[in-house]
Amino acid sequence: MKRFECLKALAAAVRDDDLVVTNLGNTMHEWLTLRPSRANLYNMNLGQCTPVALGLALALPHRRVIALDGDGNLLLNLVSLADVSHRKPANLKIFVFDNEAYESPGGMPSATAHGVDLVQIAKGCGIDRSFPATNLEEFDQRVELLDQSGVLFVNAKIEMGSIERPPYNEIDFKFNKYQFATYIEETEKKPVLRLRSRSPFTEK
């Protein structure tokens, strides 16, 4: 199963006002291809994708928040699953794309290549709706659970490899965070950024 196939199925089910947080690397670029939106927050550093999504879900309980994480990324901050279970935001949906490797820096195997089961870890933390997806049919079934209330954790076993993608320098991550923050300001009618007389992206 390829990650792009999964993301394509997920993109078809995502609403315009869903907030989507991605990890760094191939997931980010593929999601940008499928669903370019100011409601996307890209390139969360290792270990930070699920925690940032958790914070958003708690701050905006009326908005659905979707985390697009990876096995290597999540393994660096497994305690975040305990935090998710403790707080139990009903609007948080976590999809982990598990290729059993740290693909971006060269394909070194991750712990899931040696038997570590992220679904069992999530269940052990108390996230009852934790499911594997080993083929596209199973993944489609997990996507159908998006509309149900409660934390959702899906670990999708995927192949290594990605579609042809734009180079990293075509995405301005600082500007993306600014766009995301102003999108939240506009849609929630709440201040996020301190008022400035000039944009930080036009100052010399």
Regions inferred by a protein language model and the residue ranges of each:
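Short, intrinsically disordered low-complexity segments
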Residues: K2, Q141, L193-S197
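Acidic-glycine-rich active-site phosphate/pyrophosphate-binding loop
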Residues: D17-P36
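Generic N-terminal helix/loop capping motif
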Residues: A13, D17, L56-A59
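Active-site pocket-lining segments that scaffold enzyme catalytic pockets across diverse folds
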Residues: M1-D16
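SAM-dependent methyltransferases
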Residues: N169-K204
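Thiamine diphosphate
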Residues: R3-C6, E30-Q179
